[in-house]
Amino acid sequence: MGSSCRIECIFFSEFHPTLGPKITYQVPEDFISRELFDTVQVYIITKPELQNKLITVTAMEKKLIGCPVCIEHKKYSRNALLFNLGFVCDAQAKTCALEPIVKKLAGYLTTLELESSFVSNEESKQKLVPIMTILLEELNASGRCTLPIDESNTIHLKVIEQRPDPPVAQEYDVPVFTKDKEDFFSSQWDLTTQQILPYIDGFRHVQKISAEADVELNLVRIAIQNLLYYGVVTLVSILQYSNVYCPTPKVQDLVDDKSLQEACLSYVTKQGHKRASLRDVFQLYCSLSPGTTVRDLIGRHPQQLQHVDERKLIQFGLMKNLIRRLQKYPVRVSREERSHPARLYTGCHSYDEICCKTGMSYHELDERLENDPNIIICWK
């Protein structure tokens, strides 16, 4: 499990009929101080309004996650059993991935109590200590855990890491597989995704995939969005030989990182050719600059490109942020014309987007804008 949500302590707290709220067990021992527990106990053993709800509270540089349980029955002292099995993490930890685990444990313990009085029986309750120890060790080590409770009950837990929302897939974006396409089994995806997978080649943009696969554009965008979420694809811009790129500071990683070198040279070498040299590839990346198109690069460096596929070179550079694209954004300096596509000339819409929305080619758009004295081109 990632260090960002490492569990520092697991505790079991309950309401004692004479002592009130207390920590019965904690692993490791004495991790939660008396002062800390006194500060947060109203959120550990709670009023009825907060019972059976997930609660996260931060105090004294620690974050405590719990789900207070209340089981009402006349067999219990004060007619109710109140307990909470929770986790303690660093106050800065991202604990969203742990919350379902805490909620699930509360449900399991409730079921065990209702079936066999597991929590209220002092003898069986002592089994919680080894269970909590296994929980702490295995969840921190691998993010998953199997807990044998008794002969008929086993608990299986797994931390599901929260993924950030992926970028929105626009019609002019180009999806590229992050690993070998053959590594993915199309049968595991929905029917729309299965239909578009053969058309994802790292060069077709979303709109073109939609047209060639005969799938409605919004459905393609949703499918690509799903593939982005799971890290199956990433997005790059449309590759044309008139494009302009420049290296980023990360291009230095190509010199320092051996695994990146290996991945790069394997990716950019022409099929059936002698392996490209790092020197040639690095020189090609560093030769990209404002004002230099891909076509210019090919004309100036035929020797270095002898074993290098220039399309794969650009593709890999974009995927690994070794280079970035400088795009053209038309800006209309007069406000006279608001017709389509003039309303796209605001400096906020790139050539890629305008061409996709209007159906014009780059050459047609270039000619139209070059002959318009009210248009200036912003590169960014």
Curated annotation (Swiss-Prot):
Disruption phenotype: Embryonic lethality due to defective fetal liver hematopoiesis. Embryos also display reduced methionine levels. Lysosomal acidification is impaired, leading to defective lysosomal processing of cobalamin and methionine synthase. Conditional deletion in skeletal muscle causes constitutive activation of mTORC1 signaling: muscle fibers are significantly larger and show altered fiber-type composition, with more fast-twitch glycolytic and fewer slow-twitch oxidative fibers. Mice with a conditional deletion in muscle also have altered running behavior and enhanced glucose tolerance. In the presence of abundant amino acids, ubiquitinated at Lys-158 and Lys-357 via 'Lys-6'-linked ubiquitination by the WDR24 component of the GATOR2 complex, thereby inhibiting the GATOR1 complex and promoting mTORC1 activation. Asymmetric dimethylation at Arg-78 by PRMT1 inhibits the GTPase activator activity of the GATOR1 complex and consequently inducing timely mTORC1 activation under methionine-sufficient conditions. It is found in: Lysosome membrane. GDP binds at R78. The record marks S124 as: Arginine finger. GO terms for molecular function: GTPase activator activity. GO terms for cellular component: GATOR1 complex; lysosomal membrane. Residues 1-133 are annotated as: Interaction with PDPK1. The modification Asymmetric dimethylarginine is found at R78. GO terms for biological process: cellular response to amino acid starvation; negative regulation of TORC1 signaling. There is a cross-link at K158, K357 (Glycyl lysine isopeptide (Lys-Gly) (interchain with G-Cter in ubiquitin)). Keywords: GTPase activation, Isopeptide bond, Lysosome, Membrane, Methylation, Tumor suppressor, Ubl conjugation. InterPro entries: NPR2-like. Within the GATOR complex, component of the GATOR1 subcomplex, made of DEPDC5, NPRL2 and NPRL3. GATOR1 mediates the strong interaction of the GATOR complex with small GTPases Rag (RagA/RRAGA, RagB/RRAGB, RagC/RRAGC and/or RagD/RRAGD) heterodimers. GATOR1 interacts with GPR155/LYCHOS; interaction takes place in presence of cholesterol and prevents interaction between GATOR1 and KICSTOR. Interacts with PDPK1. The arginine finger is critical for the GTPase-activating mechanism. Catalytic component of the GATOR1 complex, a multiprotein complex that functions as an inhibitor of the amino acid-sensing branch of the mTORC1 pathway. In response to amino acid depletion, the GATOR1 complex has GTPase activating protein (GAP) activity and strongly increases GTP hydrolysis by RagA/RRAGA (or RagB/RRAGB) within heterodimeric Rag complexes, thereby turning them into their inactive GDP-bound form, releasing mTORC1 from lysosomal surface and inhibiting mTORC1 signaling. In the presence of abundant amino acids, the GATOR1 complex is ubiquitinated and inhibited by GATOR2. Suppresses Src-dependent tyrosine phosphorylation and activation of PDPK1 and its downstream signaling. Down-regulates PDPK1 kinase activity by interfering with tyrosine phosphorylation at 'Tyr-9', 'Tyr-373' and 'Tyr-376' residues. May act as a tumor suppressor. Suppresses cell growth and enhances sensitivity to various anticancer drugs. Belongs to the NPR2 family. This is GATOR1 complex protein NPRL2. It comes from Mus musculus. The lineage of its organism: Eukaryota, Metazoa, Chordata, Craniata, Vertebrata. The gene is Nprl2.
